[in-house]
């Protein structure tokens, strides 16, 4: 019986780990789907305007849209400017 219990308990642990991983993947996908359709284009246009006036690496600019509640969204723009 101990051998059978060993294999059965291991399957439950494996299933639990797989379930947690799947929940993480689904949460990440929901995060990206919650963005409006226009956001990628908006990010590109903002980046092009910044690069027009300041010579920076595009990787030094981060743009995020945060949903604070049902009525409020915040567009956060972080730029690391050269010296």
From Swiss-Prot:
Family matches, as SUPFAM superfamilies: Cell division protein MinE topological specificity domain
Keywords from the named record: Cell cycle, Cell division
GO biological process terms, semicolon-separated: cell division; regulation of division septum assembly
InterPro entries assigned: MinE (IPR005527), MinE_sf (IPR036707)
Family annotation (Gene3D superfamilies): Cell division topological specificity factor MinE (3.30.1070.10)
Keyword Lyase: no
Superkingdom of the source species: Bacteria
Known role: Prevents the cell division inhibition by proteins MinC and MinD at internal division sites while permitting inhibition at polar sites. This ensures cell division at the proper site by restricting the formation of a division septum at the midpoint of the long axis of the cell.
Entry's family note: Belongs to the MinE family.
Name used for this protein in its record: Cell division topological specificity factor
Species the sequence originates in: Buchnera aphidicola subsp. Schizaphis graminum (strain Sg)
């Amino acid at each position: 019986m101990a051998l059978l219990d060993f294999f059965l308990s291991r399957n439950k642990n494996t299933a639990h780990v797989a379930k947690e991983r799947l929940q993480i993947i689904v949460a990440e996908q929901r995060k990206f789907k919650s963005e409006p359709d226009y956001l990628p284009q908006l990010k590109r246009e903002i980046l092009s305007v910044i690069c027009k006036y300041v010579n920076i690496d595009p990787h030094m600019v981060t743009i995020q849209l945060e949903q604070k509640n049902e009525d409020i969204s915040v567009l956060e723009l972080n730029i690391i400017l050269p010296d």
